[in-house]
């Protein structure tokens, strides 16, 4: 399973380079590049370290694609339900 990641989004928002993030979490910049391209799923320890850098949770940083699709479906259903209730 592939995990969707917000690493690049959070890193760029923090004006941080891939090299800077790599140094903070004790990996190579190539590892960060692979994570951002979603070519590599990090270990739980590395995911935790990255989340800690951005003061967020592992759950906020990563989600499985299937969970993302489910969340989007649930969101659309909720919008439909709310729309019906407002009429």
Where are these regions (language model features)?
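Alpha-helical residues within the helix-turn-helix
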Residues: 12, 23, 52
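DNA major-groove recognition helix of helix-turn-helix
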Residues: 36, 62
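Short, charged recognition helix plus adjacent turn
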Residues: 63-87
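DNA major-groove recognition helix of helix-turn-helix/homeodomain DNA-binding modules
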Residues: 26, 45-60
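Short alpha-helical DNA-recognition segment
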Residues: 15-34
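A short, Lys/Arg-rich alpha-helix, primarily the initiator
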Residues: 1-13
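Residue-level signal for the short linker/turn that defines the boundary of a DNA-recognition helix
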Residues: 5, 15-16, 42-45
């Amino acid at each position: 399973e592939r995990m969707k990641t917000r690493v690049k989004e959070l890193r760029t928002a923090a004006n941080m380079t891939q090299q800077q993030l790599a140094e903070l979490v004790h990996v190579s910049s190539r590892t960060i590049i692979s994570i951002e391209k979603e070519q590599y799923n990090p270990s739980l320890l590395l995911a935790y370290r990255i989340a800690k850098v951005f003061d967020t949770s592992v759950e906020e940083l990563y989600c499985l694609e299937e969970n993302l699709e489910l969340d989007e479906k649930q969101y659309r259903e909720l919008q439909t339900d709310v729309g019906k209730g407002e009429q």
